[in-house]
Amino acid sequence: WPKGDPEQEYDLVVVGGGISGLSAAHFFRKNDPSARILVLDNHDDFGGHAKRNEFQVNGETRIGYGGTESIDTPSGYADVSKELLKDIGIDVERFYDYYDQELYNSLNLSYAIAYDSETYGERKLVRGYGSRPWEEFAADTPMSERAKADLVRAFNAEVDYLPGMSREEKIGLLSKISYRTYLRDYVRVDEQVLEMYQRWGMSFWCVGMDEVPAIYILGYSDGGGLPGLEYTVKREGGRGSEPYIFHFPDGNASVARLLVRRLIPEALPGSTMEDSVTARLDYTRLDQEGADLSIRLNSTVVNVEHTADSRAVDVTY
C-alpha cells in the first residue's frame, strides 16, 4: 500500500475501538498520563461487538443490547480485569440490588420447549424444562417413545460417550465437531431430539446447533441446560454459584461507554455507572483537533509496518 510522509505522530495507535482497544488506550495512558494516543476504528461507533440499540416507542426511549451482554463471572476475573472495572466506575456488587433474581419464580414462570406439529405431530408447549424430573418432562412431550427415552438417557445416564480417550483428545474432537453431530453420532439420540435442540443456539450463538462446536456446551447451564457431556468431559472452572446478573440495560455497551468517559470525560456527562446508561454521548468530542487522546471512527486501517530503523510504526488508514 503506498504511503506518504507521516501526517501525525502519536505515542500509541490502537487499531480497533472495541472494549479491548479502548482498554489498551486506558492502560497506556494510566502508565503515561502525558502520552498522545489515537484509537482508529472502521465502524461508525466504538465498542466493537458491544453494541447498543435505542428505540423510540410512543415517545419513550427503549434501550437494549445489540451484542455482547454480560460481565460474566467477575469473581473469576484476573486482577488486571478487576482493576479495569474499578477504574471506570463499575461496582459489580450493585447488580445484586438491581437484578430481581426471584422475578420468574414469583410469577410461576419456567423454561419451556415449543414443539411444532410438522416435526412432532402436535403443536405443544411443555413447561418445566430443567426444573422437573426429566422422565416427567419427557412424558408430557409429543415426541415418539424412543425420542422420549433418548432425552431422559442423555440427561440422566452417567455415561462417558468418548471412552478410551484422554481429556485432551476429547477436547480436541469436541472442538472439531458440532453439538448436533455429537448428539447424533456419539450419544445416538433420535432425530426428534436433534430437532428439539437444533435452533437452541440461534438466540445465543446466532447459528443452529449443526454449527456450534460441541465443546461450547461443556458446562452450559443456561435455559435449563444441554445434555450429553456432563460425564464425558469434566468441567473445570465455570460460574460456580455466581449468578448471571452482571449486565447493564445495553449490555457491555456501557462498559465501552464508561471507558470512553474515562478517556474523554467531556464526551459522556455524569459520574456514575448508573447515570452513564441514559447520558447522551457527544460524538463530536471523540476526535478533537490537538487532543492528546482521540477516537477516530470510520477509519479503516489498511497497512501497519515498522519504519526502516524499527524505532516506530507507520499506520496507514
Positions of predicted regions on the chain:
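Gly/Ala-rich phosphate-binding loop of Rossmann-like dinucleotide-binding domains
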Residues: 25, 29
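Catalytic nucleophile loop
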Residues: 21-22, 78
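Dinucleotide-binding Rossmann-like beta1-alpha1 core, especially the glycine-rich loop
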Residues: 59-150
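Extreme N-terminal leader/targeting segments of oxidoreductases
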Residues: 1-12, 30-36, 52-57
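Active-site/ligand-binding neighborhood in enzyme catalytic cores
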Residues: 156-299, 310
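Conserved acidic E/D residue at the C-terminus of a beta-strand in Rossmann-like folds
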Residues: 39-44
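Glycine-rich Rossmann-fold phosphate-binding loop(s) that bind the pyrophosphate
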Residues: 16-20
